[in-house]
Amino acid sequence: MMKKLIFSLTFLFILSFAHAQNMHLSFNKLLNNYVSPEGKVNYAGLKKNKHTLDAYIDMLAKTKVMENWGKSEKLSFWINTYNALTIRTIVEHFPVKSIKDIDGGDPWKVKRFTNGGKALSLNDIENNILRPMGDSRIHFAINCAAASCPPIANKAFDAENVDALLEKRTTHFINDAYFNMISHDRAKISKIFDWYKSDFPNLDAFLTKYNTQHTIVDSKTAISYFDYDWKLND
């Protein structure tokens, strides 16, 4: 009896994991087709294929985030959900010059997604689901459709690639001089580090770790921030 129970639970876990892996395939194809390697988004093309994006988001809405999912499954699910919703927000209003031209300048507060009986905004997903998971690298994976936002990856996150892809996106962002310019004496960095200070309690060590020149950032480094460009990332 116990062996049957263990087998059944194992089988259900495998099915759940397989579903979590495969659910993002259609989004992965959309990103492959409509996002450049540099993170520029072809919203006009996506608008013509909106039915595929809608079907993906509908599937996400109907998917129960299981307690037995690991952190990697949950992270990839919610990162993809955030990015898909952001893309659809732009597509529904395209052509538009900036995401801040939508919903009175604050589209992040609009409840545009329902999962598990809860209506969620982009702010809810970011601040109440993703940030509490304790991985500050999510800030370089979720995309706000703006020029100064960390470029969106042209592939979907999944349980197998999420850690490596978070690492890659973070490293790419930190070392792109459009977003961050780092030397020992002074560092001019993205406004993201100012807005989300609490997620980077040891910012000096974070910047030192991820800049590929291995420049030491410490208490002697003068920190300033780039202005944020809200122009559309197309």
Language-model features, listed with the residues they occupy:
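N-terminal secretory signal peptides that target proteins for export/translocation
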Residues: 1-2
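Sec-dependent N-terminal signal peptides
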Residues: 5-16
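Interaction/scaffold regions that mediate signaling and macromolecular assembly across diverse proteins
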Residues: 22-234
